[in-house]
Amino acid sequence: MATEQMFCFQCEQVAKCEACTGGAGVCGKPADVAEAQDALTGAMIALARTAREAGVKNDRICDLIVDGLFTCMTNVNFDGQAVTALKDAVRVETVAVAAAAGIEPVSDYDVDQIWGDDEDIRSLKSLVLFGLRGTAAYADHARVLGYRDATVDEFFADALAQLAEPGSVDALLPLALKVGEVNLGCMRLLDEANTGTYGTPEPTTVAMEVEPGPFIVISGHDLHDLKLLLEQTEGTGVSIYTHGEMLPAHAYPELKKYPQLKGNFGTAWQNQKKEFDGVPAAFLFTTNCLMPPKESYADNVFTTEVVAFPGCTHIGPDKDFGPVIQKALELGGYDEPHTIPGINGGTTMTTGFAQGTVLSVADTVVDAVKSGAIKHFFLVAGCDGARPGRNYYTDFVKATPDDTVVLTLACGKYRFNDLDLGEIGGLPRLMDMGQCNDAYSAIQVAVALAEAFDCGVNDLPLSMVLSWYEQKAVCILLTLLYLGIRNIKLGPTLPAFVSPGVLDVLVENYGIAPITTPEADLAELLGE
């Protein structure tokens, strides 16, 4: 639907669980930035259609589309001028591709045609578009490490081009599942990139105490930026603390070897305005999730890659983090040790239980299941957010029986990752598998267990209780649906962009259901 201001319903905390349509979104994105992102999306669709007509596929086209899709994710880019500049670059490429092929460039697509379409068509096209945005983030992280996959790269343009076509439920549902299939390949690629570059993650206990002295807090998902920052801070006396989804970096051998990588600062992304206020440190955002900074610390915030906020210093492609380091030295850090405990009062967290670690003890896990020591596995994973009701995930994990194992990943784990759930046969009951893209690890572990027990994944004593917030959660959900995973519990609310008709299909074919209460859901999942 066309609006005089913005229309955006891609994240979990949209206004009234419907859409953000006023002068700014709940995320803080102004209407002019939302409109610029729609214009950028329309320009990318035009580039995709022009390239298809010209029969052209190359890295330049893919890179522009990946950057554009990533830019439009929630809590990434709040700078309308930067978004418009990228749109202009996309248009220049569209004209160049057309000229080289001797054809007319396709006009920029008006995405209001999607927002105003039949609700089921709009729903499925939104699933595709938002899923592509999530997958693009993973493709970007792999790309900066030198890993690419032609199948993944070419799919972005192909899928975008299809969004401009009239479409039908019968055609768009398979396209949405194709996004899930391609995202699986992209997560596999990123897993290879991360482990090939930084080693196999290993169980690591991470402190939540900040030592005296100057320090930098690095947030986001980009391990490459962290590695560069660690290299540039050697010998400076500046310590590095991870934040949010950067926590799993502590488990990678090639990153944890740096002595200045000290610990983790704070809790999940949505608490940053409170936790960053008055902190004598520099903050570097490498990806989402950036919130509009408070004036009290805005001068200490730096962005890089596609992340941007007006007035905050942006570190360009040269990756010279000198200004960030200098700011940390100027601020000086704390005079005494300072601790920000987890939401349950814990002061340490453990990470590093990716597939390499879990599969290395697969025999022990299988034996524990066969002996009855482990009765059930729960994957409690996904995004955190500010909407009331997310304490459900804390209460759910606290209530899991002692003979069950909780696997987790992504930032939703901050609801409970400072808890000590004890052990089963030497194995911790709570295992953090990593970032959201490490859903690939969870999938591989599930597949390995299914093979060990000669059954399907849906037949395992395994339940998935997921939380979502932004578009990477969308592409992961599509991957799980592509794999045929059933009976997923999803919360804290269902996506506003999923129409009743599409929801009926997902419920009928995949058994997706909203979370209710921890007690009721636990009883159902355990068959009690």
Where are these regions (language model features)?
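Electropositive, gly/pro-rich neighborhoods at or near active sites that engage anionic ligands
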Residues: 44-197
